[in-house]
Amino acid sequence: MGTRKNLGWQVALTCMAAAASVQPAWAAEDSLVHRFLQVELSPDGAFVASVEGDSPVNATYPIVRELVIRSVATGARTQIALPCGHVPQCWPGSPAWSSDHEHLSFTLRKPGSHSYSVYTVSPDGSNLSKQIDFDGTVGDLHYLPDGKLSMLAIEGARKEVGATEAGAAVAGDLDAAPPEQRIGILTAGAVHWASPPDLFVYEYDLRPDGKGFVGTASPGDGDNNWWTAKLYTFSAADGSGQVIYSPTDIRQQLASPKVSRDGTTVAFIAGLMSDFGSTGGDVYTLPLKGGEPINITPERPASARALFWNCHNQLVSEELAGDKDQLVVLGAGHEPVKAKVLWSGSETLGRGDTSISLSCPSGLMATSRESFTAPPQIATGTGGKWKDLTTVNAGLSTPARVQSIQWISDGFTVQGWLLLPQHVDGKLPLITTVHGGPAYALVPSFRGPGLQQKLLERGFALFYPNPRGSFGQGERFTAANVKDFGHGDLRDILAGIDAAEKVAPIDDARLGLTGGSYGGFMTMWTVTQTNRFKAAVASAGVSNWQSYYGENGIDAWMIPYFGASVYEDPAVYAKSSPINFITNVRTPTFAYVGERDIECPAAQTQEFWHALKALGVPTSVMIYPGEGHGLRDPANTEDAMRRTVEWFDRYLK
C-alpha cells in the first residue's frame, strides 16, 4: 500500500507542466532540499552521474530534474543540457556508463506524455546524441559486453510504471490485455525484445557473458501481479524465458536479483513485502546451472534492502537492522556465514536498489546519504568510509533533537524515532505518524521545509514508530501482523507512546495521529479503537477492507496478508475494517486522498468521512483532482500541509 519512496503525504512523483510556476509559500527557494534520485559511478571511478533537483515544499521528489556529471577528484560539476529544457516532466533517468567510461546513456521523458527517448553524452557534456524515440516508458539501462544497451520498456504505455502513479481512466473494456514491460536491447536504432510478450518484467540483471538476463516477472497486469512474480532466465538471442525459482509460500515476494561476477550464481531478496519498490527480507542465492535456493541469512534480525557483488565476487547487502542502516559482507554466497559489518550508521544510504554504485577493481563506491538532521549529499569512499562529494545542501538544518527509542510489546522489541523541538517549554503535544506499507520502516531522512518542520517549529513533538509488520527486525517481525491488521501493531504503537512519555515531557492529553496509505488505514482504525487521540489526519486510508478488495487496482497484495480472498474469508477482512466500528469514533478527523488513487481509492476516504459526518464527529475531507497515491502537484501538497497544521492547531493547542 505504501512504498519505501512513499511517506504518506510526502510522495511527489509527477506534476502537470502548469505547476512549473508554483512557488511554495511556506519556504524560501534557497531553503528547498536538493535531492539525488539516482547516483551512478563510472567504471574507472573518475565520474559520478546523478539525477537530482530541488524538491517542492512538503514533498520528496523534484518536479524539475537535472542530469549532472561530477569529477570524483575535484567535484567539478557539469550539467547536461537536456533537449526538452529545464521544465517539469522533462525527466532524465537511469544513467548508465559504457564499459570504457567514455559515454553515459540515459532516458528522457517527453513532457506531458508517457513516451521516452534514450540519449548518449560524453563525460564533459559534449556529443549529446539521441539513440531512439520510443512510444512508451523506458528505464533501467545497462550496457552489454558488446556495447549495446539493454532496458526495461513498455510499448504504448498508458501510464507511468508503478501502482503509486495516477491511474488511467477507468473506462472501456476492463478485461483488455494490459501492456507488458519487457527487456529490450537497443540495436541500430530499434528495440529487439529479449523477454516474452506475455510477461511483465519488474527487475533484471545481466549475465556477464552477454547471452541473457536474470529477472523477476509475472504475467498480466504489472501493477497487480508483482506479489506472485517468479525468477526467470531470459535469452538475449530469442527472448525466451525459463522459470528457475517459483516461491512455494504466498508470503514470499522476490526482489533485487543480482548475478555474480563469475556468472555462476544469482542472489536475490525474498520475504513478505507489501509493495514493489519497498524491499526487505532474507538473502537467498541460487546456482544458475540448477539447484535449490539457499537462505544465507536465516533468522537474521535485520531486513536486506539491496544487494551487490563486490570486486572480489563477494555478496554485499545493504540492510536495516533496528535503528541502523548497514553494509554487510555475506561471503561467496554458497552458505550462511557470519556477516561482516562494513559500515553502520543512523542514516540512510541511497534510494532502494540503487543505493550503492561500485567501481572495480578500485572498490570505490558512490551513494547519497542523509539523516534526520543531515541533508542529502553525494558521498564516495571505500570500505564504508564516506567522504562527501557535494555541499549543495550545506546550511540546511532540522529544528529537532532526535532520539531512537526501544520498548517491549507482546514479547517483541520495537523501535521508533522521537523528534523534539529544539526549545522545550513545559509539556509538549505529540503527533504520532504511522508509516505506509505495512512492510516498510520509517528511517532517518531529511525532510526540509514541510509538515515535519512546521510542526516542530510550532512546538509539537513527533513520534515515528516501526511496529510489527515493519522492516528492520527480521522476517518473523515483518510477518507478525498477518491476519491481524490493526490489532498487534496498534498495541505496539500505544506502548511506544507510553515509552516516549517516559523519556520526554509529553502531554498525554494532547495526542495527535496521522499517516498515509497503510498509515492512513491505521489512523482510521485507531480512532475506532481508542479515544486517546484528540485529533487525527488520515491520508489515502482504507475504511472497509471488504469493499476495498474490489475497488483497488492491486488486490493481489492482500492474499499474503489475509490468507485468502475476501470472497473466501470475509470475516478476516471484517475484523480489521474501521467502518465496522465507526460508531466508537469521537476523535476529530481530517482525511484527504487523490482522485485517481488506485492503491487506496478515494471511495474509501469518502466512506469514512460520510460516516463521521452522519455521526456528528468533527470531520473534513479533501479529494485532490487528478492525483494518484500520494500528492504530486506542489499546490496540492502545500494545501494538504496547511489543512493538516490547522487541524492539529485547532484541536491540540
PLM features per residue range, with description:
Residues Q10-S21:
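Bacterial N-terminal signal peptides
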Residues W26-H34, A188-A194:
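A short helix->beta-strand "capping" segment at the edge of beta-propeller domains
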Residues L32, E52-E66, P83-C90, T107-Y119, ...:
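A flexible loop/linker signature enriched in serine peptidases of the S9 family
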Residues E40-F47, G93-H103, L141-K148, Y204-G212, ...:
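Blade-terminus and WD-like Trp-Asp/Gly-His loop motifs, strongest in beta-propeller folds
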Residues V72-G75, S122-S126, T187-A190, S235-G239, ...:
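Short loop/turn segments that connect beta-strands within beta-propeller blades
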Residues A76-F106:
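Blade-loop segments of beta-propeller domains
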Residues T78-L82, S129-D133, H192-S195, Q242-S246, ...:
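Beta-propeller fold detector
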Residues R351-K653:
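Serine-hydrolase catalytic core recognition
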